[in-house]
Amino acid sequence: MVKVYYNGDIQENVLNGQKVAIIGYGSQGHAHALNLKESGVDVIVGVRKGGSYTKAQEDGHQVFTVKEAAAQADVLMVLLPDEQQKKVYDEEIKDQLEAGNSLVFAHGFNVHFHQIVPPSDVDVYLVAPKGPGHLVRRTYEQGAGVPALFAIYQDVSGQAKDKALAYAKAIGGARAGVLETTFKEETETDLFGEQAVLCGGLTSLVKAGFETLTEAGYQPELAYFECLHELKLIVDLMYEEGLEGMRYSISDTAQWGDFVSGPRVVDANVKESMKAVLTDIQNGTFAKEWIVENQVNRPRFNAINANENEHQIEVVGRKLREMMPFVKQGKKKEAVSVGAEN
């Protein structure tokens, strides 16, 4: 059974006298920096000159270049996109680390897949809120918090666990509960969830349903409503009450269809495909492909993205969403995973 830590389980003074540098000031960086500051932690921000730099200054932080921040800090939290971390680490962070520092991440990708190899004389740990930055910030302001994960990769000081928990507490995570994991488990389950269910699996299911209806002669507008628009209603119920609560809230007809038709769509073959996806994550195949794709400036990524954006479901959806002013738009880049823009 997973171990969960709350505020009362965590030492108060572990971060006292420690200067924490937040590297990156996107969705997560913004939330971490403000929450830490309001928890009494000595915080600075390291970011490249530009919009994020100015925004961090406007929020009242001491702002430096990444290299300058890294040179001052005792604790460095790297909150940059996965694909940017290695370059920034190699060029601006690595040579600034001193023995006894803490190198912290919110996702284990680069450490687990050996893109970043920390020196042997620093603590390395992970603190990962299970929610987007704006939610981490909003719940903190409300006196609550978002559950978080923590993991220890390297404990030189003998206090890495205490430091990780203290950090999680300072951003509000221990108000909701902090769960212990490993870099391997966090990285592999996070990637699998994104690929097989939350992003890849879901978008493919939605498109397949839409195409099935339109190819059978149904109007694309109705197909959009049935296969995409109404998804939020169901997901919200699942989010709040689980599968049981969702099924309680829908009609008996819908529930019966769930029971008898769902397993026909997501059958044993789909599960075998999921296992293959997991294997590619575990053995590093996916990571290698993504790293190489970025090294050659993303030709496949960009081509697929452009093609997907012109799928009929997108063309129809843009028009229908204009009819619904209650649907919030314009937040395409709000970070919903742990990585944040710098």
Swiss-Prot record:
Cofactor(s) this protein cannot do without: Mg(2+)
Active-site residues from the entry: H107
HAMAP family: IlvC
Lineage: Bacteria, Bacillati, Bacillota, Bacilli, Bacillales
Coiled coil: none
Gene Ontology CC annotations of this record: cytosol
Residues reported to bind Mg(2+) 1: D190, E194
InterPro entries according to UniProt: 6-PGluconate_DH-like_C_sf, KARI, KARI_C, KARI_N, KARI_prok, NAD(P)-bd_dom_sf
Family, per entry: Belongs to the ketol-acid reductoisomerase family.
EC numbers: 1.1.1.86
KARI N-terminal Rossmann domain ranges (all copies): 2-181
Keyword NADP: yes
Cysteine disulfide partners in this protein: none
Co-factor remark: Binds 2 magnesium ions per subunit.
Residues annotated to bind NADP(+): Y25, G26, S27, Q28, R48, S52, D82, E83, Q84, Q85, G133
Reaction catalyzed: (2R)-2,3-dihydroxy-3-methylbutanoate + NADP(+) = (2S)-2-acetolactate + NADPH + H(+); (2R,3R)-2,3-dihydroxy-3-methylpentanoate + NADP(+) = (S)-2-ethyl-2-hydroxy-3-oxobutanoate + NADPH + H(+)
The protein's name in its UniProt record: Ketol-acid reductoisomerase (NADP(+))
Domain KARI C-terminal knotted: 182-327
Pfam families associated with the record: KARI_C, KARI_N
Binding site for substrate: S251
Species this protein is from: Bacillus pumilus (strain SAFR-032)
Binding residue positions for Mg(2+) 2: D190, E226, E230
Gene responsible for this protein: ilvC
